[in-house]
Amino acid sequence: MNVLSCSINTLKGLYDISGVEVGQHFYWQIGGFQVHGQVLITSWVVIAILLGSATIAVRNPQTIPTGGQNFFEYVLEFIRDVSKTQIGEEYGPWVPFIGTMFLFIFVSNWSGALLPWKIIQLPHGELAAPTNDINTTVALALLTSVAYFYAGLTKKGLGYFGKYIQPTPILLPINILEDFTKPLSLSFRLFGNILADELVVVVLVSLVPLVVPIPVMLLGLFTSGIQALIFATLAAAYIGESMEGHH
Amino acid sequence: MKNVTDSFVSLGHWPSAGSFGFNTDILATNPINLSVVLGVLIFFGKGVDLLDNRKQRILNTIRNSEELRGGAIEQLEKARSRLRKVETEAEQFRVNGYSEIEREKLTLINSTYKTLEQLENYKNETIQFEQQRAINQVRQRVFQQALRGALGTLNSCLNNELHLRTISANIGMLGTIKEITD
């Protein structure tokens, strides 16, 4: 009897160790919708980090930038550079959009990789990077779709739809399909990468809690930065593509 | 055996869900690895001096601009002083030119005056000369008229007796003249 309970305990323990929570959500009921509360909480934290640091950085601007101001100017320059390379000469109005995308995704990803979210315990599910949830990435990808449609329509009016039959009308179905695959690929790429990163780290931590996960975590930092850059670059590229004149 | 498994279980123990709270399990919440990762990040982030480079670049740009500005101001100053010099020279030239013109005018007026005077003199001389000639002519004419009248008178009323009387009177007159002259 004793031996049995002992072995049951052992099994339970082993199960607990390898029990990684996926698909567990902390649901909030808002107006008939079930929302993922943990994602909202981490998003708010990310937004607060971004707004707070930006406010602190630009509070006392100097001619010769130092510290935070220098850093934020560098980030802005980087974003402008990305937008300029992808969109072209008329990149100016799109810098805020691209910058928002890049900064939000980047800080989200890195918050998942750097902040000890798991210290805070939720009734259900657990806190992680907001981009760890498909809803966030789909929202971002749909915003990108709306943005590139808006960019094309304001630039060329209804003539924008001429690009669907651009090389030949035979490609019409593929061109229409592209409008669906773009947000799909954007959202799935980001979601998959971040979820995979975090899962690998969680699994490794549950198996070997110390030292071993560190290289993977560093790799996760690298890939999440790259993913943010890819998302921003692709969004800018789509906007640029819909704005460029056809010859 | 039980102790070992218990410790093993507690090692992987997940606090049961249900309410908000803090997970105090150091191994599960993973702060050690996170701090190591953060430390590595900060260490290598410090090594990359993008921001320092940027600051240095901005400083250099500002310094260059200052230098260029200084140079430009200097050049402007130089150009201004040259302009001033040229202006004064132009002023001098203008003044000189005016005085030259004034002098020229005066000399011209003077020479014209002289010419005019000379012409006046010529005119006066000519007038005098003409006058003189006219007077002479008149005189001559009057003289001829008188002579002709006298000759007529003489021819009409000269007879021998008168002739002789005249001659004798003249001889007498000449004689007295001779006496006087002697």
Swiss-Prot record, chain A:
It is a multi-pass membrane protein. GO terms for molecular function: proton-transporting ATP synthase activity, rotational mechanism. Pfam families: ATP-synt_A. Its main location: plastid. The chain crosses the membrane at residues 38-58, 95-115, 134-154, 199-219, 220-240. Coiled coil: none annotated. CDD domains: ATP-synt_Fo_a_6. One of its GO terms (cellular component) is chloroplast thylakoid membrane. Belongs to the ATPase A chain family. Key component of the proton channel; it plays a direct role in the translocation of protons across the membrane. This is ATP synthase subunit a, chloroplastic. It comes from Nicotiana tabacum.
